[in-house]
């Protein structure tokens, strides 16, 4: 943001940083999930057990994430009180930042199979897709919209990583994720 929005860049950066501090609640949930799930899923399960548990875990992760998303988004005016008054103008980007944080957990869940199968070189492909999306959308959106563009660029980056992880999963390690139910959780949260 600092170099892409020359006029008022530090103010833009401050607003974006303040709003991401509110969204840290979602990242704390993600970290707790990661610290519990990674050792669990990387232990020695039969493939059929691993696939079933991984599919169920993603569904429940998204369900819990959507509850946290709703709790923060619906009470964003209360959460806005923890940041300075001059930073509150950017509170409208909070749902976008929260959405990006949810997607971080989704692609983590989609990555367990290649960690388990010791194909971690695929992580380079996934993060490379995220990097390309962040750079492309960042250079396009940030000069136009400032911190709003930065939030959308991050969401695009996380979406790209989820998309590539999903594609790799479908191709090399098909897992029966309940995408219909997961989509329902997301749709209900977005409607509310």
Q: Model features per residue range: what roles?
A:
Residues 42-46, 98-129, 169-171:
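Membrane-interface junctions at transmembrane-helix termini in multi-pass inner-membrane proteins
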Residues 1-39, 100, 104-108:
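Transmembrane helical elements of multi-pass membrane transporters/channels
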Residues 19-59, 111-116:
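Helix-loop junctions and terminal segments of transmembrane helices
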Residues 8-13, 72-103, 108, 148:
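Interfacial segments at transmembrane-helix termini and the short loops linking adjacent helices
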Residues 95, 129-133, 179-192:
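Transmembrane alpha-helical segments of multi-pass transport proteins
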Residues 6-12, 121, 128-163:
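Membrane-interface helix-loop junctions in multi-pass transport and translocation proteins
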Residues 17, 45, 49-75, 91-94:
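Interfacial transmembrane-helix starts/ends
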Residues 24-28, 69, 105-108, 131-138, ...:
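Hydrophobic transmembrane alpha-helices of multi-pass small-molecule transporters
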């Amino acid at each position: 943001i600092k170099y892409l929005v020359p006029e008022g860049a530090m103010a833009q950066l401050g607003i974006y940083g303040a709003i991401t501090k509110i969204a840290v609640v979602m990242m704390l949930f993600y970290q707790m999930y990661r610290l519990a799930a990674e050792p669990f899923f990387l232990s020695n399960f039969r493939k059929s057990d691993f696939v079933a548990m991984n599919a169920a875990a993603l569904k429940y992760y998204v369900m819990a994430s959507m509850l946290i998303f709703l709790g923060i988004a619906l009470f964003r005016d209360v959460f806005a009180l923890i940041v300075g008054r001059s930073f509150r103008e950017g509170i409208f980007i909070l749902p976008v930042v929260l959405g990006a944080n949810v997607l971080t957990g989704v692609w983590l869940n989609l990555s367990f199979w290649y960690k388990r199968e010791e194909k971690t070189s695929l992580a380079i492909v996934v993060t490379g897709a995220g990097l390309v999306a962040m750079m492309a959308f960042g250079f396009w959106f940030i000069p136009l919209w400032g911190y709003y563009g930065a939030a959308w660029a991050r969401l695009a980056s996380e979406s790209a990583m989820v998309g590539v992880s999903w594609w790799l999963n479908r191709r090399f390690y098909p897992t029966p994720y309940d995408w219909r139910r997961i989509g329902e959780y997301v749709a209900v949260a977005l409607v509310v």
